[in-house]
Amino acid sequence: MKIKKSILVKSELLKLNRGNAKLGKNIWTFSLPAGFSCPGALECLSKANRDTGKIADGPNTKFRCFAASDEAQYKNTRNQRWHNFELLKGKSSEQMVKLIQDSLPQKASLIRIHVSGDFFNQNYFDAWVEVARKNPGRTFYAYTKSLHFWLARKDEIPENLALNASHGGTHDWLIEKYQFKSAKVVFSEKEAEEKGLKIDHDDSLAYHSRDSFALLIHGTQPAGSLASKALSALRKLGWTGYSRKAKIAVAMLFLSFSLVPDKYWSPWVREGMENIFPKLKYFGQGIV
């Protein structure tokens, strides 16, 4: 059954975007201001001032929220997220359902709820649950530290809404107690291996798997922090992040490795390439 949309001008609608270099263009994303809409944030709590963009980290911040860094750098990003937040605040769950429904692009079949931000109250969480229920042909997914809202509706989550508990919040104890599928930020591949977790590089484990997983630290981190040191170590190993430029660089390396005959590679270079490229091959997909 098609959902009839109200006729609204763009300024009255929420703003969604196509996925970035990490996620791919098949994923649509929705965001709110980092920190300001995250009642469960603790270890990643960071906020970019709405007017100036200046970053303020929370007292317990261990790694800076990458979304707050984006807002600090890009005023348009900051403005868009506050636009969405202002439209939603103060509305009933039913009003939010209507607003979200009216704002969803017709072609959007895979939607990430919150590249930035989180479920800021129970009514808002309930609204997304209902939107997912009204759109069985679409897949929705989210990372969240608002586990108390999830717990309140634990038995009412539709199959097409994939929730991932994000470690490092004020309600972490609920993850183990209720066996929520979860995502944990790690500082190295070795740490992920020690925890028995696969690293998700493109969100596919977030929306397609039922198992918990890890996310590799990225973004801009506070100088001198453990997260900053871990990021520096990763870069020394060749990790360049998720930007399109990084994808192109890896893709070109992979193409060169594939085309150059074996006789032109020394044995130790060949062995090193064969060890690293299985981990990086996914990263150039869609570029070459």
Label each region the model flagged.
Residues 1-288:
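Class I S-adenosyl-L-methionine
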